[in-house]
Amino acid sequence: MIKRRGNVEIRVYYESVRTLRSRSHLKPSDRQQSPGHRVFPGSPGFRDHPENLGNPEYRELPETPGYRVTPGIHDNPGLPGSPGLPGSPGLPGSPGPHAPPANHVRLAGLYSPGKYAPLASPDPFSPQHGAYARARVGIHTAVRVPPTGSPTHTHLRQDPGDEPTSDDSGLYPLDARALAHLVMLPADHRAFFRTVVEVSRMCAANVRDPPPPATGAMLGRHARLVHTQWLRANQETSPLWPWRTAAINFITTMAPRVQTHRHMHDLLMACAFWCCLTHASTCSYAGLYSTHCLHLFGAFGCGDPALTPPLC
């Protein structure tokens, strides 16, 4: 039926009601060649369809009902079962003989080799699953003690190297509470002090790993920049010059040589001390610097008083 609307010609086709009746009395060839009949991939007559007999790709389709080719899987050559991958016979994109089990995940046409977690956790005390208990013991990880009567496993013992030593117990005292100290500093000192506190928190959270050397070099560059700006802004003699000179000399020397957390701790404390010298009379961290920055005071003979030998 043809309808016209202006210059547009519309062709309308009506399907006869007789095509909706059962076609079981027809031959398979008649059902495939009849108009209006569609053969879907995976159906018994799909491979024998006249249009698909010469297509080698469809000749390999299985006859399992409900078989579905995931779209998009043919485009990724690095996936299992993709074209060009050794050991992948059959349809490109179909799982090969060494493909993972059926519990893989298919999302949006992508193949993910991830598997579901096992229902039961392995026994760490069995010989087969002993590797599950070989994880490195962290700061907050409790050491699992084997039950009474079980053989002692060396891999369950805590590594004595992970024990914090007495020398490392007082490292990195600058934490998140130190950020409240920013309002007491001049505006041109706050960015540097904030960087010092953030690096201190990062190193305290990763005390089991060596400190990154690039961080020490970055602190040295930042310290030299703010110290140069402070010198230009204070052309006249300032009583802070000796102390800030001692601090910046130590920072410049230590920054490129950071190897241990003790080095990083001393560098950070010297940087924070440099910042807080601007309000030395009211600084609430004066006691902290008196504990961790004695080496700076000793540089100018202001360390512990020398003991006078008795006269008799």
From Swiss-Prot:
Top-level taxon: Viruses
Recorded GO MF terms: zinc ion binding
Entry's induction text: Expressed late in the infection cycle.
Biased composition (Basic and acidic residues): 46-62
Keywords: Host nucleus, Metal-binding, Phosphoprotein, Virion, Virion tegument, Zinc, Zinc-finger
Family from the record: Belongs to the herpesviridae US10 family.
Zinc keyword on record: yes
Region annotation (Disordered) ranges: 20-106, 143-170
Protein name per its UniProtKB record: Virion protein US10
Record's comment on post-translational modification: Phosphorylated.
Zinc finger (unnamed): 271-283
Any Pfam family the entry gives: Gene66
Signal peptide: none
Major location (coarse): virion
InterPro entries the record matches: EHV_Unk
Gene Ontology CC entries for this record: host cell nuclear matrix; viral tegument
Compartments reported by the entry: Virion tegument; Host nucleus matrix
Disulfides per UniProt: none
